[in-house]
From Swiss-Prot:
Family: Belongs to the MnmA/TRMU family.
Location of the region described as Interaction with tRNA in the Swiss-Prot/TrEMBL record: 163-165
Gene Ontology CC annotation, any one: cytoplasm
Species classification: Bacteria, Pseudomonadati, Pseudomonadota, Alphaproteobacteria, Hyphomicrobiales
Role noted for this protein: Catalyzes the 2-thiolation of uridine at the wobble position (U34) of tRNA, leading to the formation of s(2)U34.
Disulfide bond residue pairs: C112-C213
Species: Sinorhizobium medicae (strain WSM419)
Protein name listed in UniProt: tRNA-specific 2-thiouridylase MnmA
Enzyme class name: transferase
Gene (name only): mnmA
Keywords: ATP-binding, Cytoplasm, Disulfide bond, Nucleotide-binding, RNA-binding, Transferase, tRNA processing, tRNA-binding
Length: 398
């Protein structure tokens, strides 16, 4: 077996590397070339990069494409650029805006991975005769411990917990996992940068890319307003107990759990606890109203060994992350008449619809990724849940 788990010599194995122009994917290309693989580098031009050309931490923009080209020249592999701007807008940017005006907190990186990178680019890699598509993500894959067929693989958390990207990859399908390779899964980021220096790559000291590459300076509301001019409609700021406290200029300016910049002063600390898109109301309340014990999921991608329905009916004990920066915490995957849900044993504050809930076998660096889903509804403590239900059933002011 070679280092990518193929039963052939590296020189007989063609690999396409998804190159963003950053240090991680550049090192992947360099490592594979050094090991003797037949390597092709492909960079996707994903969005109108005019505003991002000179912005540190951008991704798949003008300078990034040039950096990827220079890296490929340095290590001696072919480099191709594919224009996916229209596809990226259709499958990532537009749904991102739609989700925000619906009162959700979307994660466009998941959509990008599943549509543009792991679907379209993967198909292109196969057309080029590649045996695998390699990326610079910090996650591990290896042969499945209980394979149902030859070549089945499973996902695991990486060695560098601070760089763990498994949360953004929960929706990777089994077919995609079998074809993908993640050479950096066993390396710390510091070693990746050291390798870039050793290889003489121009990106060795380049800043890491931002989570949301197409949002300049992190101002989500700017891009949503541009794409959806009617999104910034005014409405009420309402307390969980029914009091109208003020007005806002669009729910897209708020997120669940927000405390600063709400726009009301009451003498008590208030947090955004719910965004009522239908009635254009921002619902605020005390911190304890953010406490969440249960989240209902949609679009579940299941990577466990037993059937999803059987696992949920029996109450599948696992660990869950509802934020990329948190460690997995004890959870139970179950189901009821409403659908699949995850019971968060220790609770979590400020969980918003649209966020992901990724599932794991444990909390360590070698924990297996069981998949996950998008949160469609969160359930609070009984008192807060009852108050919110009563408020939503009451008509909003005209």
């Amino acid at each position: 077996m070679n280092s990518l788990d193929f039963d052939r010599k590296p020189e007989d194995t063609r690999v396409v590397v998804a190159m963003s122009g950053g240090v991680d994917s550049s090192v992947v290309a360099g490592l594979l070339k050094r090991e003797g693989y037949d390597v092709l580098g492909i960079t996707l031009q994903l969005y109108d990069h005019g505003a991002a050309v000179h912005r540190a931490g951008s991704c798949c923009a003008g300078q990034d494409i040039d950096d990827a080209r220079r890296v490929c020249e340095t290590i001696g592999i072919p480099h191709y650029v594919l224009d996916y701007e229209a596809r990226f807008r259709e499958t990532v940017i537009n749904p991102f805006a739609e989700s925000y005006i619906a009162g959700e907190t979307p994660i466009p990186c998941v959509a990008c991975n599943q549509t543009v990178k792991f679907a379209d680019l993967l198909a292109t890699a196969k057309e080029l005769g590649a045996d695998a598509l390699a990326t610079g993500h910090y996650i591990r894959s290896r042969p499945s411990p209980m394979p149902r067929y030859p070549g089945q693989r499973a996902l695991y958390r990486p060695a560098d917990a601070d760089r763990d990207q498994s949360y953004f990859l929960f929706a990777t399908t089994q077919e995609q996992i079998d074809y993908l390779r993640f050479p950096l899964g066993g390396l710390p980021k510091s070693e990746t940068r050291a390798l870039a220096e050793e290889m003489g790559l121009v990106v060795a000291k380049k800043a890491d890319s931002q989570d949301i590459c197409f949002v300049p300076q992190g101002k989500y509301s700017d891009i949503v307003s541009k794409l959806k001019p009617n999104a910034a409609l005014a409405g009420e700021i309402v307390h969980l107990d029914g009091r109208v406290l003020g007005a806002h200029e669009g729910i897209l300016h708020y997120t669940i759990g927000q405390r600063r910049g709400i726009g009301v002063a009451t003498g008590e600390p208030l947090y955004v606890v719910y965004l009522d898109a239908r009635s254009r109301r921002v619902v605020v309340g005390p911190k304890e109203a953010l406490e969440t014990r249960r989240v209902y999921l949609r679009d579940v991608n299941w990577l466990g060994d037993e059937e999803l329905e059987a696992a949920a009916r029996s109450g599948f004990e696992c660990f869950a992350k509802v934020r990329s920066t948190r460690r997995p915490a004890p959870a139970v995957l179950s189901c009821d008449a409403e659908g699949l849900y995850v019971e968060l044993v220790e609770g979590e504050a400020g969980v918003a619809p649209g966020q992901a809930c990724a599932l794991y076998s444990g909390i360590g660096e070698d924990a297996r990724v069981y998949g996950g889903g998008f949160i469609r509804r969160s359930e609070r403590e009984p008192a807060a849940e009852a108050a919110l239900k009563a408020l939503l059933q009451a008509p909003a002011a005209a």
